[in-house]
Design a protein with these regions (language model features):
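Post-DEXD/H (motif II) to motif III coupling segment of the RecA-like Helicase ATP-binding lobe
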Residues: 86, 149-207
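Inter-Walker segment of RecA-like/P-loop motor cores
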Residues: 94-141
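Conserved ATPase-coupling elements of RecA-like P-loop NTPase cores
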Residues: 136-140, 149-161, 179, 283-286, ...
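Conserved strand-helix element at the start of the C-terminal RecA-like helicase core
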Residues: 84-99, 173-175, 180-181, 216-242, ...
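Conserved interdomain hinge at the start of the Helicase C-terminal
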Residues: 74-81, 155, 159, 166, ...
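N-terminal accessory nucleic-acid engagement/regulatory domains that precede
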Residues: 1-33
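Conserved RecA-like helicase motor core of SF1/SF2 enzymes
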Residues: 242-304
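Conserved two-lobed SF2 helicase motor
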Residues: 66, 122-142, 265-284
C-alpha cells in the first residue's frame, strides 16, 4: 500500500528511479564481467609463466644450504669463475663489490651493477650486482643467487623469487640458510627444473661469552656490532679516544672507503672493528669475538 501511494504521487520520479536501478545492475553485473575477462587473460595465473624465456630452458639448480661461514658462497664462486659468462646476485652493494674485487683479482673480468654504482669493465662477461638489478633478458652460463633466505623478507623478498623463476642460466647456484630450503625447492620444482642439494657444515665452533663485558675489556680482533651509522661512529670515536685504533663499516659507506677500512683491519693496523650487522652478509673478516652493543634493533617499523 505504501509503494502504491508513492507511485500515485504526481511528482514521484519513476523514470529517474528506473534509470538508477538499471545503472546499478549494469555496474554490478555487466561491467565486472567484461572487465574481469580481459584482465584474467593479461595476468598470469601462475607466476612462473611470467618468464617464458626461462620456461623454454632446461635449467639445473645447485642449492648450497647451511649456516653462516660454512663455505656456501665460496663453493658457488669457484664454479662462477670457471664459466664463460656469469652473474652473481647479492643482497647488499657491499657484497657485490666484494665479489667483483675477488673475480677481477683472480683474473676473471667482472663488472659491477647496483642501484647506486655502475662499473663496466671492458670485455667482461661476468657481472656482480644486487639481486634487484638482474637482467632477465640476458643469458648467463652460471648464475649465483646469494643469501636466498631473504626470499621471506616482506619488502625485498620478491627479488629473490623473480631471480629463481626468471634467470636465464642453465646452471643456477643458490646459497641459503636451512629455513628457506623448503620454499626454494617448491619454486624450483614448480618450474620443472632439476635440482640437487649440497649441505654445508661449520668447521669452527661458536662459543658464547658467559656474561656481558665492558668496553675496557675489548681485545684486538674484536668486532663491535651496532645497528645504525650514528651509533657506529659514536663507538668508533670512543674507542679511538681510548687509544684503540678502530676500523668502521656500515652500509652507506662508499666502497673505496670501506675497502680501505677492511684492509687496515686485515693488516692489523687497527685493533678493533665497529660495524653494523651488514658484515654478517658474506663479508669474510678475521674477527676474534663478536660483541653486540645492544640486543635490540629497529627494523624500520618496530624494535625487536
Amino acid at each position: 500500500e505504501a509503494a502504491e501511494a508513492f507511485l500515485a504521487l504526481d511528482d514521484f520520479p519513476v523514470a529517474e528511479l528506473l534509470d538508477y536501478s538499471l545503472y546499478a545492475l549494469y555496474q554490478r553485473d555487466f561491467v565486472p564481467k567484461y572487465i574481469q575477462a580481459p584482465l584474467e587473460q593479461l595476468i598470469e595465473v601462475d607466476p612462473k609463466d611470467e618468464y617464458p624465456a626461462a620456461r623454454l630452458m632446461q635449467r639445473h639448480f645447485v642449492i648450497h644450504v647451511g649456516g653462516t661461514n660454512t663455505g656456501k658462497t665460496y663453493q658457488s664462486i669457484q664454479r662462477l669463475k670457471q664459466a664463460d659468462s656469469g652473474v652473481y646476485l647479492a643482497p647488499l652493494r657491499l657484497l657485490a663489490c666484494e665479489i667483483q674485487d675477488t673475480l677481477n683479482h683472480d683474473g676473471v673480468a667482472c663488472s659491477l651493477l647496483t642501484g647506486e654504482e655502475e662499473d663496466l669493465v671492458p670485455m667482461a662477461r661476468h657481472i656482480a650486482s644486487t639481486v634487484e638489478k638482474l637482467n632477465l633478458y640476458e643469458q648467463y652460463e652460471v648464475c649465483v643467487i646469494d643469501e636466498c633466505q631473504m626470499i621471506a623478507d616482506r619488502e625485498r623478498g620478491f627479488a629473490w623469487t623473480r631471480a629463481i623463476l626468471g634467470c636465464q642460466s642453465e646452471e643456477v647456484h643458490i646459497c641459503t640458510a636451512p629455513e628457506a630450503l623448503s620454499l626454494v625447492l617448491r619454486l624450483i620444482k614448480s618450474c620443472g627444473d632439476t635440482v640437487e642439494v649440497h649441505e654445508h657444515e661449520r668447521t669452527t665452533r661458536l662459543e658464547y661469552l658467559p656474561e656481558p663485558i665492558s668496553l675496557e675489556e675489548t681485545e684486538p680482533g674484536d668486532a663491535l656490532i651496532a645497528f645504525s651509522k650514528k651509533t657506529v661512529l659514536e663507538y668508533a670515536d670512543r674507542m679511538n679516544a681510548a687509544g684503540h685504533p678502530t676500523s668502521i663499516i656500515y652500509g652507506a659507506l662508499p666502497y673505496p672507503a670501506r675497502r680501505m677500512q677492511m684492509d687496515r683491519f686485515l693488516r692489523r693496523e687497527t685493533e678493533l672493528l665497529v660495524a653494523t650487522d651488514a658484515i654478517g652478509m658474506g663479508l669474510n673478516l678475521p674477527v676474534r669475538r663478536i660483541l653486540f652493543t645492544t640486543d635490540k634493533k629497529f627494523d624500520g617499523k618496530h624494535s625487536r
